[in-house]
Curated annotation (Swiss-Prot):
Sequence similarity: Belongs to the ATPase alpha/beta chains family.
Record's protein name: ATP synthase subunit beta, chloroplastic
PROSITE patterns documented for this protein: ATPASE_ALPHA_BETA
EC number in record: 7.1.2.2
InterPro entries: AAA+_ATPase, ATP-synt_VA_C, ATP_synth_F1_bsu, ATPase_a/bsu_AS, ATPase_alpha/beta_chains, ATPase_F1/V1/A1_a/bsu_N, ATPase_F1/V1/A1_a/bsu_N_sf, ATPase_F1/V1/A1_a/bsu_nucl-bd
Enzyme type, top EC level: translocase
Length: 498
């Protein structure tokens, strides 16, 4: 018997009468626990081990039941280090799944997998909690309309638009602007959609998580003066944590996002960095649970585990969860089972290019490599589709001509090709834009560009109306009117110098 988990404290739910078991075996992060006959916990129930180690230090380890072994024994995975645990220690069955705080109290705070704050800013209001395991929304609850999720970022909205309630893969190495792009999306969804964001750091470096937190405070995404006005909740399960924590931290972040969608009826942005680490943690646990490994040593339940997470990320009639997932590709092998399983769920891919970052074009989104299932005339309309295709054709032609330009120079090209190159260079620069979250570094105010404005701007460049303008006029501006004004200023400056 248990009290409703939605009214209980953080971490796990309270009980009227607790069932006690004892540890009979410990293998790394996996415990076998024996319970009295007829008092077996359910799969996914939280178990808590409390006691003292041999040095007299207090121990408080939460585990999750994964298997029922028979003979009144269960196998559970620990959510924190099992150092100091010994056979014979008492284990409490909490009677329900791990529950975490949800709602406005989570904004601006950092949590671990159990929903405990780890930012030293005091306790969190735990009057509303939710279990991390639940079913995906029923088919009847889903919102089946195909709608574009406008981000205000030109290159994304024009060439690889995001779907409202869709899943986007973000591919990029270190130092190409992934974090800044993530922060800009968090900022824009708060301003344009009145929504909030949840960031799930799954198996990432502690340093990166700390850097992200500091940058969010600096750029105002997390409001230090009034924490309730922050636009994001952070959930971290870092690289140094046991596989149980890394395997479940994605579900903790998703549970917080689901509350904003279902109860507050908001549009939510859910970031998972990195989805590969979720699979990797599942693989580590799978072997310890005694399952036979599948292809390349991955767990045989890979598709099921991925599906149970991804199917909960969707649009309902109340609101939407749009998910952006950083995807690490092991050894750049796209056929590896982990990325291959992830691709099956993605609606769009945003690829960040080191070459563009080296040119100083930010956001460094590769316009030719990034894709979206939304870029179809029946969804985005003929005008948007035609403009996007012509932009891609122009950039593709420029890419083909680059070898010739490098060897022979621009003068050897035909008149038509020279015009294409000039327009492509303008397009390339116009795809850059100043970000709100980068204002503190660049000094130039951020710009949110609506989709209609974006399309109009690229149509004007493609039509040839702006051929006389210098290409630097298109660099780091918002809409096309700003580029025109910048061109006029550049012309006036050059006339004054003469």
């Amino acid at each position: 018997m248990r009290i409703n988990p939605t009214t209980s404290g953080s971490g796990v739910s309270t009980l009227e009468k607790q069932t006690l078991g004892r540890i009979v075996q410990i293998i790394g992060p996996v415990l076998d626990v024996a319970f009295p006959p007829g008092k077996m916990p359910n799969i996914y129930n939280a178990l808590v081990v409390k006691g003292r180690d041999s040095a007299g230090q207090p121990i408080n380890v939460t585990c999750e039941v994964q298997q029922l072994l028979g003979n009144n024994r269960v196998r559970a995975v620990a959510m924190s280090a099992t150092d100091g645990l010994t056979r014979g220690m008492e284990v409490i069955d909490m009677g329900a799944a791990i529950s975490v705080p949800v709602g406005g109290a989570t904004l601006g705070r950092i949590f671990n997998v159990l929903g405990e704050p780890v930012d030293n800013l005091g306790p969190v209001d735990t009057s509303t909690t939710s279990p991390i395991h639940r079913s995906a929304p029923a088919f009847i609850q889903l919102d089946t309309k195909l709608a574009i999720f406008e981000t205000g970022i030109k290159v994304v909205d024009l060439l690889a638009p995001y779907r409202r309630g869709g899943k986007i893969g973000l591919f990029g190495g270190a130092g190409v602007g992934k974090t800044v792009l993530i922060m800009e999306l968090i900022n824009n969804i708060a301003k344009a959609h009145g929504g909030v964001s949840v960031f799930g750091g799954v198996g990432e470096r502690t340093r990166e998580g700390n850097d992200l937190y500091m940058e969010m405070k600096e750029s105002g995404v997390i409001n230090e003066e009034n924490i309730a006005e922050s636009k994001v909740a952070l959930v971290y399960g870092q690289m140094n944590e046991p596989p149980g924590a890394r395997m479940r931290v994605g579900l903790t972040a998703l549970t917080m996002a689901e509350y904003f969608r279902d109860v507050n009826e908001q549009d939510v942005l859910l970031f998972i960095d990195n989805i590969f680490r979720f699979v990797q943690a599942g693989s580590e646990v799978s072997a310890l649970l005694g399952r036979m490994p599948s292809a390349v040593g991955y767990q045989p339940t890979l598709s099921t585990e991925m599906g149970s997470l991804q199917e909960r990320i969707t649009s309902t009639k109340e609101g939407s969860i749009t998910s952006i997932q950083a995807v690490y590709v092991p050894a750049d092998d796209l056929t590896d089972p982990a990325p291959a399983t992830t691709f099956a769920h993605l609606d769009a891919t945003t690829v960040l290019s080191r070459g563009l970052a080296a040119k100083g074009i930010y956001p460094a989104v590769d316009p030719l490599d990034s894709t979206s299932t939304m870029l179809q005339p029946r969804i985005v309309g003929e005008e948007h589709y035609e403009t996007a295709q012509r932009v891609k054709e122009t950039l593709q032609r420029y890419k083909e001509l680059q070898d010739i330009i490098a060897i022979l120079g621009l003068d050897e090209l035909s008149e038509e090709d020279r015009l294409t190159v000039a327009r492509a260079r303008k397009i390339e620069r116009f795809l850059s834009q100043p970000f709100f979250v980068a204002e503190v570094f660049t000094g130039s105010p951020g710009k949110y560009v609506g989709l209609a404005e974006t399309i109009r701007g690229f149509q004007l460049i493609l039509s040839g109306e702006l051929d006389s303008f210098p290409e630097q006029a298109f660099y780091l501006v918002g809409n096309i009117d700003e580029a025109t004004a910048k061109a006029m200023n550049l012309e006036m400056e050059s006339n004054l110098k003469k």
